[in-house]
């Protein structure tokens, strides 16, 4: 509840004590009353879950927490402030540059500028040096609240700012921040002064359309990163270098996994034979898993009468992400962006009884979503992708058990791929369908199931889908990055919109609850993420080529061919490399393609009935293992059958892969 100007505000501190202060008190005064040392360390505060800086007047009471460098939420404040320091530096060196906006983003910040010529690497170096001068000058971030006329006067030479001002409602507070001579239209929050921004680096520049609209002017966006310590900055730069080494677009080409072709269309993936093997293995594994968990497979069309999406609400709430209509015989059809309406139609094809529930429909369904060309990114951001969609139709009483089953399914799936994960509970967005009461009930149900299982989670306020709250699983890859993973969504709205029913034990009609879930989500994105997670060196069960048999000389070729034939009969994907190339060349070729195992066979191995086994993961300097052919095949087939992670030579470690919540 927003307090009135004449109200006293009650603030509850983390230790349970309270402070009563007048409306409009500055947070820094509250922090000072707690302790001078805390004030020196304070960067911002959090009031009722909302972060604000130390100079924004308090307008509401509630929980009050001081943010210091030790708090993850303070990092966004630091980075937003670094964006302002960047704009200050650019304005000093390029006074004619028109300023856009500069938010904090994951791992850093950016700022948009309208300039006559694109920025160069030399420009970035000069801007970064100037930023260090601004930091050294220790300018305080001074906040002012101004009326519209004063704001327009201050930004008369900045048309991008004037455009934003024109959109603000009459009752909105207009605030500006200055650091030294630079002034910016901004809501904050900011750190107390520029000297707090010590460890930063400008990364690169790229064109960006104003407000992401390709019909608008193109700006120059400068990206940067900022951290509280030099060690954190250095570690981040190292991760970036490692990420470049793992880039799925580069590895996808080197390993011949996938490609795109402008003749096919932007954002549409062509799966090559080697990539198709990886995808097929994942789908086969997941199909076995979900059938064991009680799902039934279904298929729905790629193109659907758009009236179905009017009923579902997608045409109103998701239209900008849908492809345009295709008119056929007076009826408009759309490439489907979602599989759920089709599954609902299957549910409604029969009268359902409570004895039929829960019903669990699953589909590897290809969907199509419009993305601007500027945001397309390899396999990670595409326009057509296959989604492992499933929908559970159940009674309200069955919801907790079904969610618990889904959590077990997700954990079993992710453990096989070696992903730790965190869970976010995403709550009601602004464009939500349904009443707040329905949403609160759904959110409470998800939270209660997580808490009953002892699973840690964080809240992503406003991050739910328009038809229901969801659990988002964030996968943590080998270099610590987070990826979008499985989702579980609780939906009371679509059953209402479609009029779904089942006949209860009382012989009356009742409304079922619908659960949406994906495990890998977009198959394209998941495989792209796996390529980077494994750096292209897939576990044996996923590897396009599992074993390469290499005869040292022509004299042992037939014996090597016999080993390759036995491996193929055992179900392994094997290649016999008997080319007239040197042994080192052929080993290097297998290493380049990240083939997990190489069986090198010479005269000595033929006589002993053995192979010299090399593992890709052990590198070029390893000493080969001498194994009998039977032992080799037993080991590799066991590793495939158990879907072992590299180096395990057995089943993947058990469940419990959830990482600590942030």
Protein language model regions, located:
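NTP/phosphate- and nucleic-acid-binding module
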Residues: 1-100, 106, 112-662
């Amino acid at each position: 509840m927003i307090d009135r100007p004449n109200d006293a505000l009650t603030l509850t501190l983390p230790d349970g004590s309270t402070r009563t202060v007048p409306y409009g008190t500055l947070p820094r005064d509250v922090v000072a009353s707690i302790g001078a040392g805390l004030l020196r360390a304070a960067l911002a505060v959090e009031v009722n879950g909302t972060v604000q800086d130390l100079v924004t007047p308090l307008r509401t009471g509630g929980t009050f927490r001081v943010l210091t460098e030790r708090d993850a939420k303070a990092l966004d404040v630091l980075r937003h402030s670094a964006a302002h320091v960047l704009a200050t530096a650019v304005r000093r060196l390029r006074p004619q540059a028109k300023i856009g906006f500069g938010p904090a983003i994951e791992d850093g910040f950016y700022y948009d500028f309208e300039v006559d010529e694109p920025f160069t690497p030399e420009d970035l170096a000069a801007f970064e040096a100037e930023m260090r001068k601004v930091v050294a000058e220790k300018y305080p971030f001074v906040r002012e609240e101004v009326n519209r006329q004063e704001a327009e006067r201050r930004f008369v030479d900045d048309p991008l700012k004037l455009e934003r001002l024109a959109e603000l409602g009459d009752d909105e507070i207009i605030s500006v921040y200055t650091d030294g001579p630079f002034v910016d239209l901004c809501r904050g929050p900011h750190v107390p002064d520029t000297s707090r921004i010590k460890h930063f680096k400008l990364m690169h520049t790229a064109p960006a359309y104003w407000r992401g609209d390709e019909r608008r002017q193109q700006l120059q966006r400068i990206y940067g990163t900022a951290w509280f310590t030099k060690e954190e900055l250095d570690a981040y730069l190292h991760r970036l270098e490692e990420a470049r080494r793992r880039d799925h677009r580069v590895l996808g080409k080197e390993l011949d996994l996938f490609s795109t072709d402008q003749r096919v269309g932007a954002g549409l993936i062509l799966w090559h034979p080697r990539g198709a093997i990886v995808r097929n293995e994942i789908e086969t594994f997941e199909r076995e898993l979900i059938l064991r968990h009680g799902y039934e497979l279904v298929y729905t069309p790629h193109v659907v009468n758009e009236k179905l999406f009017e009923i579902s609400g997608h045409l109103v709430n998701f239209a900008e992400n849908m492809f345009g209509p295709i008119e056929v015989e007076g009826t408009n059809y759309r490439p489907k962006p979602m599989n759920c309406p089709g599954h609902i139609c299957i549910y409604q094809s029969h009268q359902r009884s409570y004895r039929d529930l829960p019903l669990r429909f699953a589909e590897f369904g290809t969907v199509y979503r419009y993305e601007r060309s500027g945001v397309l990114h390899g396999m990670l951001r595409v326009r057509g992708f296959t989604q492992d969609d499933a929908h559970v139709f159940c009674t309200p009483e069955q919801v907790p058990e079904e969610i618990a089953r889904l959590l077990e399914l997700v954990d079993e799936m992710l453990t096989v791929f070696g992903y730790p994960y965190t869970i976010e509970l995403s709550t009601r967005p602004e464009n939500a369908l349904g009443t707040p009461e329905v949403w609160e009930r759904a959110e409470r149900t998800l939270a209660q199931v997580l808490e009953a299982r002892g699973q840690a989670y964080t809240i992503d306020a406003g991050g739910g889908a328009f038809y229901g709250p969801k659990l988002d699983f964030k996968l943590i890859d080998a270099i610590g990055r987070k990826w979008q993973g499985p989702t579980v969504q609780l939906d009371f709205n679509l059953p209402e919109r479609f009029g779904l029913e089942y006949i209860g034990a009382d012989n009356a009609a009742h409304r079922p609850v619908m659960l949406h879930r994906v495990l890998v989500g977009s198959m394209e994105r998941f495989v792209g993420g796996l390529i980077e997670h494994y750096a292209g060196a897939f576990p044996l069960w996923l590897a396009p080529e599992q074993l390469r048999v290499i005869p040292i000389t022509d004299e042992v070729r037939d014996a090597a061919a016999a080993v390759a034939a036995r491996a193929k009969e055992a179900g392994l994907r094997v290649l016999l490399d008997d080319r007239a190339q040197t042994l080192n060349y052929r080993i290097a070729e297998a290493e380049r393609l990240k083939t997990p195992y190489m069986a090198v066979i010479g005269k000595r191995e033929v006589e002993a009935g053995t192979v010299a086994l090399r593992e890709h993961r052990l590198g070029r300097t390893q000493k080969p293992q001498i194994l009998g052919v039977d032992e080799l095949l037993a080991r590799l087939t066991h590793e495939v059958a158990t879907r072992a992670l590299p180096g395990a030579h057995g089943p993947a470690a058990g469940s419990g892969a959830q990482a600590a919540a942030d």
